[in-house]
Amino acid sequence: MQCPHCHHNGSRVVDSRPTDDGRVIRRRRECESCGFRFTTFERVEVTPLLVIKKNGTREEFNREKVLRGIIRSAEKRPVGMDVMTQIVDEVENKIRALGVSEISSQLIGEYVMNRLVDVDEIAYIRFASVYRQFKDTGVFFNELKDMLDKDKLKAKKETNGKSEAK
């Protein structure tokens, strides 16, 4: 690191400590040439993630927008804020793990719905009705039927698992 006083390119770290909730590291440095002490800050450079909307426009990923959608769908439902925040965390981590710079809003919605269906089925249906834009009651009915079929299959597996354990 170049010294701001004498512009020598050598310095040593005297002290290092995390700040800002652990996302930034503050380092005290000392120039090897003139002994001048100065502070530097180190943080992870996060590449922006762009969301491709249905109309083709792009906007930066906004986790608060995803959270608002989940909150709206879970309104008056027994879903805690911590659970909703955890869903957003999991979805964001999954997206970032893909290593892509752009992702469709449809895929984000699918990731949210995959988690929400296990948390609260009513919240899931509400969220799906917005993301999948149900055009009529037939499409809505088919979504409900698919969910009920999955529930029956899950219940059947649980019942078979219990009878095999006996």
From Swiss-Prot:
A zinc finger (unnamed) spans 3-34. Transmembrane segments: none annotated. Binds 1 zinc ion. Residues 49-139 form the ATP-cone domain. InterPro entries: ATP-cone_dom (IPR005144), NrdR-like_N (IPR055173), RNR_NrdR-like (IPR003796). Its cofactor is Zn(2+). Keywords: ATP-binding, DNA-binding, Metal-binding, Nucleotide-binding, Repressor, Transcription, Transcription regulation, Zinc, Zinc-finger. GO terms for biological process: negative regulation of DNA-templated transcription. GO terms for molecular function: ATP binding; DNA binding; zinc ion binding. It comes from the Bacteria. Belongs to the NrdR family. NCBIfam families: transcriptional regulator NrdR. Negatively regulates transcription of bacterial ribonucleotide reductase nrd genes and operons by binding to NrdR-boxes. This is Transcriptional repressor NrdR. It comes from Levilactobacillus brevis (strain ATCC 367 / BCRC 12310 / CIP 105137 / JCM 1170 / LMG 11437 / NCIMB 947 / NCTC 947) (Lactobacillus brevis). The gene is nrdR.
